[in-house]
Amino acid sequence: MSEVKDRALRALQLMDLTTLNDDDTDAKVIALCHQAKSPAGNTAAICIYPRFIPLARKTLREQGTPEIRIATVTNFPHGNDDSEIALAETRAAIAYGADEVDVVFPYRALMAGNEAIGFELVKACKQACREANVLLKVIIESGELKEASLIRKASEIAIDAGADFIKTSTGKVAVNATPEVAEIMLRTIAAKGVQKQVGFKPAGGVRSADDAALYLKLADNILGPDWADARHFRFGASSLLASLLNAAGFNGATSDSNY
């Protein structure tokens, strides 16, 4: 197998195939489920708004891929600082049947100097997720934090509060995942010695097989070549799938999103 194809297949199996658009419909979510069962293998998960979870669960089961996980979003996309609302949304997502919850960290509170709000919000959501055996990913919105020190601090707080993954971005702001931010976040995981428990998810702007290969190379270099499995690494993306299928020698799939 060629190295290019090998890398593409590896990345495909680490995708959270995503649609988080205001105009999402049942038909679009069903199409996303079909795309997640690709000719080159299944993506790790799909990521959708909570209200579509029951439909997605039914579709994945009927197409013979119940193992594809369902991720959703809470406190999304603005990262407000009300822990009660974030917790209520997270509990509702769990009740809908989510396997994984991607919660937005209250990044503006951190930028204003308040570290406690983020810790308490993530801790509360983690407790709800732990009780339901649901994975918690924390979106720090790195493109808004901008400064390396804030990106590192948000990552540390999320990890200390129990995050199973730290995730770069919502995909709803001007700057989303970048290799520079990925390196900071991956090195934070390494520095805290939590690579067994905590994973990393770049999201937004990861569109090509070459992009994906660059992020995986970073993970391999910083945390070891065997670290980036589906429990420790995901890509939040939609248009990436077509590029990966093309690189792997399959006809490209289409996507309505540019996430």
UniProtKB/Swiss-Prot annotation:
Pathway per the UniProt entry: Carbohydrate degradation; 2-deoxy-D-ribose 1-phosphate degradation; D-glyceraldehyde 3-phosphate and acetaldehyde from 2-deoxy-alpha-D-ribose 1-phosphate: step 2/2
Keyword Lyase annotated: yes
InterPro entries the record matches: Aldolase_TIM, DeoC, DeoC/FbaB/LacD_aldolase, DeoC_typeII
Class in the EC hierarchy, top level: lyase
Compartment annotation: Cytoplasm
Active site as annotated: 102, 167, 201
Coiled-coil region(s): none
Reaction equations catalysed: 2-deoxy-D-ribose 5-phosphate = D-glyceraldehyde 3-phosphate + acetaldehyde
Gene Ontology MF terms in the entry: deoxyribose-phosphate aldolase activity
Family: Belongs to the DeoC/FbaB aldolase family. DeoC type 2 subfamily.
Annotated protein name in UniProt: Deoxyribose-phosphate aldolase
Species assigned in the record: Erwinia tasmaniensis (strain DSM 17950 / CFBP 7177 / CIP 109463 / NCPPB 4357 / Et1/99)
Lineage of producing organism: Bacteria, Pseudomonadati, Pseudomonadota, Gammaproteobacteria, Enterobacterales
